[in-house]
Amino acid sequence: MKPAILPKLMLGLSLAAMTTAAHATDDAFEVWLNPSIEYDLSKHDSIELETAQRFRSASDGRADTYFVWAWLHHDLNETFTLSGALEQRENDGGFDEVRMIQQLSSKHGFIRTRVRLEERWVEDQSRMGFRIRPRLGVVVPINDSGDWSFRTDAELFLTVRSTSKGGQDGLTGLRTQFGVAHDVNDKLSLSLTYLRQQDFHDNAPDRVGHAPLIGVSYTF
């Protein structure tokens, strides 16, 4: 990638979040954790158990949420990885959710892309929902050894079919994040990221969460 392209791309990701400032928002502070373990089945295949915990304030209607994903990854080549997962989401107060996920991710120099498809079943909702989540990001090494890196990305939530009749479709969310990651060794990676999650609402203020995201990943 030419050096001049990188600042422009990073500026574009930042502007994606800034353009939402004109909308009325309901903001709150949250804490997100994202530990995971992965095991290599072969040179090109691996399984991963990923979890996430989102701690929020119940007083403003934001329940704590707990996730677990069972992933199967297959490296198609050095650029593309195809993945599938089953996800279980538990919300304090109900409306738990099960998702089937298909995902294609890629690496192009500094550029990272990901497209995720989700089939969603939400407790007490009338039908299966379908959502597309495209993500564009940048990963830049910040030391000579390459074990420290800066990363940023922006992800859209495109709801093709809501989980209930009359539910909101179209662009329903935007997630942006930036932070640093450190490869402690060949097996252990740590990351600390600022994450901003904005859920768009047609007839109400957009709901925005601001969270430090702490990631821990271990590979066997």
Outline where the language-model segments fall:
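Bacterial N-terminal signal peptides that target proteins for export
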Residues: 1-10
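Surface-exposed strand-loop-strand hairpins of Gram-negative outer-membrane beta-barrel proteins
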Residues: 49, 53-65
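Outer-envelope beta-barrel architecture signal
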Residues: 27, 43-47, 78-80, 109-115, ...
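N-terminal signal peptide c-region/cleavage motif recognized by signal peptidases
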Residues: 19-21
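Transmembrane beta-strands of outer-membrane beta-barrel proteins
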Residues: 32-38, 46-52, 69-73, 81-87, ...
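Outer-membrane beta-barrel transmembrane domain signature
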Residues: 74, 109-110, 116-202, 218-220
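Residues that define the transmembrane beta-barrel architecture of outer-membrane proteins
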Residues: 29-31, 64-66, 96-100, 126-132, ...
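Outer-membrane beta-barrel domain signature
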Residues: 23-26, 56-61, 89-95, 122-127, ...
